[in-house]
């Protein structure tokens, strides 16, 4: 399992892309997707919602459990991935590509996000 170097990671197992025009993409890591098992339902924040770093903003339901989705940053949701709502298996099959969850206009990024190497060491993945 490989964690893309260009992303940053939270200890809640979300990833964050670099901000493009102040907007970053958020998803869950392959480690989290594997731990969840087959994802069957995704609830995402809605466009216009304000999300806060470290707080819940949705949930992922798998055949094993229901897990909260945490935002790695504070900001306004500008897009939710309807493809992943329609086909939750994308979270498992492509967590770093088509399985992204939402895009957020970042107002504040916490200082404790991890690099790919730090996340790999933290998660053991």
Curated annotation (Swiss-Prot):
GO biological process per UniProt: glycine decarboxylation via glycine cleavage system
Function: The glycine cleavage system catalyzes the degradation of glycine. The H protein shuttles the methylamine group of glycine from the P protein to the T protein.
Pfam families registered for this protein in UniProt: GCV_H
N6-lipoyllysine carried by residues: 64
Name of this chain's protein: Glycine cleavage system H protein
Subunit structure: The glycine cleavage system is composed of four proteins: P, T, L and H.
Lipoyl-binding domain span: 23-105
Cofactor binding note: Binds 1 lipoyl cofactor covalently.
NCBIfam families: gcvH, PRK01202.1
GO cellular component: cytosol; glycine cleavage complex
Domain of life: Bacteria
Gene3D superfamilies per the UniProt record, alphabetical: 2.40.50.100
Residues in coiled coil: none
UniProt KW keywords: Lipoyl
Keyword Signal: no
Family note: Belongs to the GcvH family.
Cofactors: (R)-lipoate
Species of origin: Streptomyces avermitilis (strain ATCC 31267 / DSM 46492 / JCM 5070 / NBRC 14893 / NCIMB 12804 / NRRL 8165 / MA-4680)
